[in-house]
Amino acid sequence: KRGIKVPVYTTAQWDGRIMREHPEWLAVDENGEFIDTQGVPAPHFYHTICLNSGYRQFFKDQLQDMIEVIGVENLDGIFMDILFQVDCKCEHCVRKMQELGMDTESKVERMRYAEHMLDEFKTEISEFIHSMAPEATIFYNGSHVGPRSKNSFKEYSHLELESLPSGGWGYDHFPATSRYA
């Protein structure tokens, strides 16, 4: 009516239910521990999900269900939150890195692979969404759109700036960051 778009919000790499029901889908650090980027005592939902695991198909199934329930004609777009590069050394990432001839013992190589894998994930998910809803807007939120995102900008329909006057951002974050958006 007034041209205001309302995208559907969903999270990607944090999900309390998935964390509890599918520990085999969680990202693992070099010591074999689940990756918890927030350091919050349990109970929490901050164990990071590995996008190379069986979760990828689950996520696609969830997106398909959302699109079918909402209806393509009612879907303005999809805002996917909590997507970031992870120094993951789970069996899925190790196998994929080995296939690419990468050194799984090198943190630098693991982070290079993490960037590659996240870009690949965004491409796959964007193609998947657009195969069902060609006009849907797509945004992947990883806290900050910056240089690490540049390889996958083609997968975004637009860019957004997340800036809250709380936490680590504060009131001075938005004016400075918006000059670079």
Where are these regions (language model features)?
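Aromatic- and acid-rich polysaccharide-binding/catalytic face
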Residues: D81, G146-Y171, S178
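Alpha-helix capping and helix-loop boundary segments enriched in small/acidic/polar residues
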Residues: Y113-H116, G168-D172
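Hydrophobic beta-strand segments of well-ordered beta-sheets in folded domains
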Residues: K5-P7, D76-G77, S157-L159
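Active-site neighborhood of glycoside hydrolase catalytic domains
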Residues: G54-E155
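Active-site-adjacent "subsite" loops/lids of carbohydrate-active enzymes
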Residues: K5-I70, M111, T123
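Aromatic- and acidic-residue-enriched segments that line the glycan-binding/catalytic groove
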Residues: Q13-A42, M80-E105, Y156-H158
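A cross-domain feature marking catalytic cores of carbohydrate-active enzymes
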Residues: G3-A12, I82, Y140-G142, S163
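Short, intrinsically disordered, charge-balanced linker/junction segments flanking boundaries
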Residues: K1-G3, A176-A181
